[in-house]
Amino acid sequence: MHTAIRIGTRQEFDNNHINEMYRLRARVFRDRMGWDIPTIAGMEIDGYDALGPYYMLIQDADRRVRGCWRLMPTEGPNMLKDTFPQLLDGREAPVGRHIWELSRFAIETDGEQTFGFADLTMHAIQELVTFADRMGITRYVTVTTAAIERLLRRTGIETTRLGSPVKIGVERTIALDITVDAIRAAVCKPMPVAA
């Protein structure tokens, strides 16, 4: 499947694609994963979307949004610090201009798998490295599930837990700190040189 992966602010995308992303999030988080989250007109939008985040949109050849990720600096409000501080075991959330938060990862794939992640997801993770290099990001923090943590490790991405797992809703939830270098080492393998 031919895909295009772009990262930009809301203003850099067509409004229809942004709304399609919000609908994808509702399908994945509310419908498929069973999260108890509010939706508006079939779209999952939260207060952090009003703070000028960057979005990764993954689109297929027909320009349909198949996946997304939200990226935000940690210097302002963010999910880990302000919504899920219980995942930090009483410690302060990582904050700094070189530390960004990843949230609202949602994807619909065609079923192709690579080490537990679809090829599409692996390409998206590689784009996180490119974005980090462009923005001077050295670390990402994220609130995710223990299952995703296992998949990251199986892929070879070293992660650091910021606290103990906590059951939130239907998920065993964990906060992770991931260096960009760890992502790069695991998923951005150099191409072999032709002889």
Predicted feature residues:
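C-terminal "cap" of GNAT-fold acetyltransferases
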Residues: V170-M191
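Short, cationic low-complexity segments
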Residues: A194-A195
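Short acidic (Asp/Glu) patches
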Residues: T39-I45, D49-G52, N78-G90
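Short connector loops at helix/strand junctions that flank enzyme active sites
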Residues: L51-P53, R64-R66, V95-W100
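Short beta-strand micro-motifs in enzyme catalytic cores
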Residues: G52-M56, H98, R172-L176
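Acyl-donor binding region in acyl/amide transferases
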Residues: M79, P85-T173
